[in-house]
Amino acid sequence: MAYDNSNVKPPIIDLLYPSEEQRRACLKRKAQIEQLPTEFEKDLMLAQLSEQLTPHNQYKMTAILGELCDDISVAEYRLDIIDDLLADSALTTTLRKVVDKMLVNDRTNIYKLTTPDSFTVLDTALTAFESYCECMEILHKLYEEKSSGIRSAGLKKLFDFFEGHYNSKHYKKLKAESEELRSAMTGKIRSATIGINFDENLVPISMGLVGFSDKMYEDSGTVIDRILSFGSKNNDHKVMRDLHERFDDPQSAKREEIVNNLDRALFTELDKVTKKYVNSIDDILNEYRAIGFEDMYAIEYQLDFCSGAVMMIENVRSKGLEMCRPTLLPESQRKADIKGLFDPIYFKEANVWNLSNKPQKQVVTNDITFDENAGFYLLTGANNGGKTTFVRAVGICQVMAQAGLYVPASSCEISLVDCVYTHFPKEEQVGIDASRFTTEVKEFKAISDCITNHSF
């Protein structure tokens, strides 16, 4: 049974659907389509087509393609976003990189954040928030530079979301507190004086913090300093070598443990100062959570869809072929007029082949028209002559048009359909009632029971 996910919590910003009502309608339709024969997803190789859009989130890409959206305004909404991104490569690249950086930072750093117990953890936490602020500043600057050229409602909503957070009291407080904490950390403690007790053999037996300073400690060149310096030169102005250098022994599995223990011990000894730092990090984290960054995660795969479409178009055009924005017609017109059509699956296969083989494979384009005078075609030809490739190209063109994508053709005027049905030859199977003929008759009957005047 298909899963109806139309009631799943909607994303805070949606680059796929103009409204929540349309999102629910499309997802409900997807669930209904899954009750029908859906061999078209396999026969048209939609999973491989998704790989051309993006190497990430392929399951979701295939789901969008298999949705067969029947709402022209939804498809146009997506096409408008692609037009904006296609018109400005800097907008596409910057938006994709910055959003990726924000999401990775949230997943790998901020999400795992715990109460700092060392200077290393404290610095990692603060650096994560500084990275978030840096991304917000870049997006704000990008909006100021590009806003006048943005036409699509989807990208306008996306930047309105970022600008809303940029101007919010939570972001302003987060940014100010991050800057204040960094200033305090870099200016408050630059060196610490530690008292060490030795036994009669000069073996250290205990130690404690004597004090700290906002200035670096310089080597005085005394005998005891040289003992503590572990052989460092007197003129390098260091009491001892850097901790990471001192314990940088590839044979020692305890290296990080030793350094971290020293870090934590000093952090604890400086409790009067570091407690304020910890409280500051807690305050910054609270402001970050108030911004509601978790709502950003739906943007990731939606941006993959839109920016992946742009990269696919640019790749095709760089090879001398064309992809175009389709003119979408209502189901009732039952029409398609496609010029310069090619199969994107074969296009990729040919490109891979041509990298290391001769003779080169050529991608052939074709024209086809469906209207009141031509609604059925009988395609004949020799084996390996391109029949399946051509039929697949027509099906993919229909699917991509309804997904709100540019199609693999130089021009395309096409009506929406309620479903796409395919019936490609199957391999012989072993078992009772599993002959190729029996299997194909059953599948053909399943299709004939479902088709309507608006099916393809």
List each model region and its residues.
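Phosphate-binding glycine-rich loops and adjacent basic patches that engage nucleotide phosphates
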Residues: D84-V99, F119, D225-D248, V259-K272, ...
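Conserved amphipathic alpha-helical "coupling/scaffold" segments
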Residues: M1-M207
